Amino acid sequence: MSVNTDFAETEVDERQINLTRFPLFFPEKRTFFLEGSEYFNFGTSSGGGQYHASFLPFFSRRVGLVAGSQVPLLFGAKVFGRLGDTNISVVDVGTRRLDDAAAALVLPAKNLLAVRVSQNLWEESRVGVIFTDGNPASSGPAGADYNRLAGVDFRYATSRLFGDKNFTFDAWGVYDWWPDPDRKKHQGYGFRLDYPNDLWDMNSSYGYYGDGLDPGLGFISRPGVRTWSAMGAFMPRPDPGRGLGRYVRQFFVEPYVEFYWDLAGRLETRTLAVSPAVQFQSGDRVEGDISSTYDVLPFDFEVADGVVLPMGPYRYATFRVGFESASHRPWQVELNRHFGRFYSGRLAETEVGLSLRLKGYVTLGAVANLIRGRLPQGDFDENVYELKAGLFLSPDLGLMNYVQYDDVSKQLGWQSRLRWQIMPGNEVFLVYNRNWERRWDPMRRFAPLGDHGVFKVQLTIRP
């Protein structure tokens, strides 16, 4: 149970640059929703990687966050656990009325509900159902702007295929109800075959997402499409101590294909890629990608401020080279360079990450993401910079500072977060947030946008 809940102690999101016409995916970081979140794994959402970011029937970040504004919570109740072979999770949240004049956003008080029940089968399989009720973003009166979703999924998993191999088959289907007379196809369904093993790692998945599939408490990146993808990775290990095996731990060759069609069967996007990589005995890793993309823009698309791509088909090829140093060292380096064609022009992206651990007490990190676009419709430069500094006097007491700047919003943000765990479940937080905006009035400067400080004591009562 939680009453008058706020999440002031939560770490801020990492800023991202979006060069697609689809929404970005930001992971949940709030402890109240993270605890027991694995019980809501549904269909292929438990498969990891990109499948977490394509469709989730329940996505807890929809609760308490609407269009960048925080919606105050009146209460939150959650029950999760296992009864024999039955897994149960229920989340029920009541929100207060929101009247945000600055964002021109008015939302009435609401009740939001998500229920997930699954039954373990055999040793590693399961069958389950999910139900959600509520639309956090609706501005209509209670009951008039409803959004409900129901779904069923099945997983067959074994670790003894051919004696000692892993294999998983997932199938799922959902339907949602909400008042939209123009969109008739509210269903979604799909399957995934997965063979994740050491020498061969292969998977293939298919998904159908109706144009009316829009779960109020879920996440969907691309409705109104059918999609199929397949990947097969060959990962041999040289004989250690002989020849290449003295230096190389494992080779990777990973071809990948992905197709998107609209519901009338017309091809929208096709991606063909291959990703070679080498992991050395030291733990360092060198990798790359070669990718060919065909994409049809159904409308004029503003890829950056003032840079508009005309609707129509585009073909382009991109390349990536990357390096990641071993994590066992006190310092770590990660480098990625993307380059090649991008729609009607060219794009180059450089990612640099550095981290340093000093005797377990101090951590330092810096990340820079630099994008340079050169198109006939216009040029653009977009950058994100991040700095992290942590001081940990013990596993229970630490101070974390996080600074971010991007030149799209032109905002600089700083969060300082002190956490003291008195005992498991009982914590004290002292959090300070401050933001600035880069302006030219009349000279270049960072103008303060505001600050916010919070002192919070979190107590857990366990019967």
Residue ranges and their predicted role:
Residues 2-245, 249, 291, 296, ...:
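Outer-membrane beta-barrel channel domains
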Residues 72, 160, 164-463:
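Exposed, low-structure sequence patches enriched in small/polar residues
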